[in-house]
């Protein structure tokens, strides 16, 4: 399953992990669809929020590559794809400089987003604080002296940042208002995003356990982690039903087309006999989540 990395360019592309970006954009698109539903959509907010999220996700990916190498999770025994630093083509100092670069880009893009979106200094300060928290979370998931990912807290972070803050924050920056129904969709996205992380951790359960990374699958075991994965998939789609029946926006049920793809992902994870068979499910769940959001948005705006 491990693809050999032969050049430095390949190593950097591998470190960026482009396949994670669709999931990162899903919450931004969801918040923007909801803003359009409320007739308050702004293109500049969508573009800047998407750019900021991409920078943050790349920062997180680089930090993950760096941190797991330092802490020993990316050893030769790891069954997932080869990481960039692990390949030997990128040094730890080089990776650290790249982390600084994308940290600065995330901050700059986020500040520009806030300058465009809000005029009230209290709101500006609030969202600046949330943005700095997002940068901190991206870096310290596996990096630093006490990475929270090694304590099994990654699921909470993903649920909050990819779900609640991603959707609600984007909606607010478009509309400068709060709509209770957006919380329901934020919960759905939080569930789906957490499922992606859970599949990642199921894949890496053996190497994580040896490295002392106490992810949820390591703590509860593979079988219960698979059950947990089903709960996340089902819960996310349950909240869609709650949104649809409450708002009477019946066309949003179009998103259930993606639900059937998620079911296939769940079955794939359950049937996988090893990490090599689990790995493709990761990308499929991320893409299914983005498709879910797009279908939801189409149904919402019809």
Task: Label the predicted regions.
Residues 5, 81-180:
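Intramembrane alpha-helical segments
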Residues 30, 39-63, 126-139, 179-199:
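Membrane-embedded alpha-helical segments that form the functional core of polytopic membrane enzymes
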Residues 158-205, 223-226:
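Functional transmembrane core segments of multi-pass inner-membrane proteins
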Residues 245-302:
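Extended hydrophobic alpha-helices typical of membrane-associated regions
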